């Protein structure tokens, strides 16, 4: 365990310094300088992702409590910068959440920072129905998705893109930050469209193993010859033919 941090730690781990051997992979979130340092060393070492600001979408219906929703939006916004977005098809919830946000922000130590984040990166969105709400969520592909409904499982089949999904009124996103168990290193900035959260599989490698005998090689030789001829790579064909003389 090394007591180091920041961009300088990324450099030390990527290239090695006295007392620290270079590594093959660097993972985990950090500030802007850490993110840019990881981007710079990628290729010399592997990385997990370029982590952006924290973000949450709350997908809520008429059963959601406005104070619960507001608390989840603020909890991510207090990272500053952080993004908090509510998508609902129950119009009265928009005004109720806006009022709850104002009340809670003045009561919190980091309320000023969270308020600034919500002004710059927050949104309260009214969808036509649950299907449109799910489509908008998929387009945004959030790091955290909180489905605040009595039957949140009903939305899972409509959602493809989210780093971590929190179901029900009593599953705040903070559980995933600290206690719940699944990876907290999650795709941000819309990258949940193609990326997953960090997992044990990210620390494993695979190698393909191929073995043919002479009979199997003879059966496939003509296919190799034809493709090699198309590409003009005669040595490829020759490496097969020399074994079949």
Task: List each model region and its residues.
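Short, basic, helix/turn surface patches
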Residues: 1-13, 26-36, 112, 173-178, ...
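Structural motif
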Residues: 1-2, 23-27, 31-33, 48, ...
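Conserved NAD(P)+-binding/catalytic subdomain of aldehyde/semialdehyde dehydrogenases
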Residues: 2-84
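Electropositive phosphate-/nucleotide-binding environments in soluble metabolic enzymes
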Residues: 3, 7, 31, 50, ...
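Short, well-ordered secondary-structure micro-motifs
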Residues: 14, 37-39, 69, 96-98, ...
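Gly/Ser/Thr-rich active-site loops/lids in small-molecule metabolic enzymes
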Residues: 49-55, 82-87, 91, 95-99, ...
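A glycine- and small/hydrophobic-rich beta-loop-beta segment
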Residues: 75-78, 86-162
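C-terminal core of ALDH-fold dehydrogenases
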Residues: 138-245
């Amino acid at each position: 365990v090394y007591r180091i941090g920041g961009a300088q730690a990324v450099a030390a781990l990527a290239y090695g310094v006295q007392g620290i051997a270079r590594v093959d992979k660097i993972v985990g979130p950090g500030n802007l300088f850490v993110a840019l340092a990881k981007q710079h060393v990628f290729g010399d070492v592997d990385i997990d992702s370029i982590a952006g600001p924290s973000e949450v979408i709350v997908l809520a219906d008429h059963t959601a409590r406005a104070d619960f929703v507001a608390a989840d939006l603020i909890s991510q916004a207090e990272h500053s910068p952080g993004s908090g977005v509510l998508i609902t098809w129950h119009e009265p919830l928009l005004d109720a959440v806006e009022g709850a946000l104002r009340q809670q922000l003045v009561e919190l130590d980091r309320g000023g920072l969270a308020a600034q984040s919500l002004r710059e990166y927050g949104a309260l969105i009214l969808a036509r129905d649950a299907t449109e709400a799910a489509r908008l969520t998929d387009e945004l592909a959030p790091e955290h998705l909180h489905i605040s409904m009595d039957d949140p499982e009903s939305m899972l089949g409509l959602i493809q893109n989210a780093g971590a999904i929190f179901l029900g009124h009593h599953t705040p996103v903070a559980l995933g930050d600290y206690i719940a168990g699944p990876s907290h290193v999650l795709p941000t900035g819309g990258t949940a469209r193609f990326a997953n959260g960090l997992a044990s599989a990210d620390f494993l490698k695979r190698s393909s193993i191929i073995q043919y005998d002479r009979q199997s090689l003879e059966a496939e030789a003509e296919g190799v010859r034809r493709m090699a001829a198309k590409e003009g790579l005669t040595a490829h064909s020759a490496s097969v033919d020399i074994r079949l003389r």
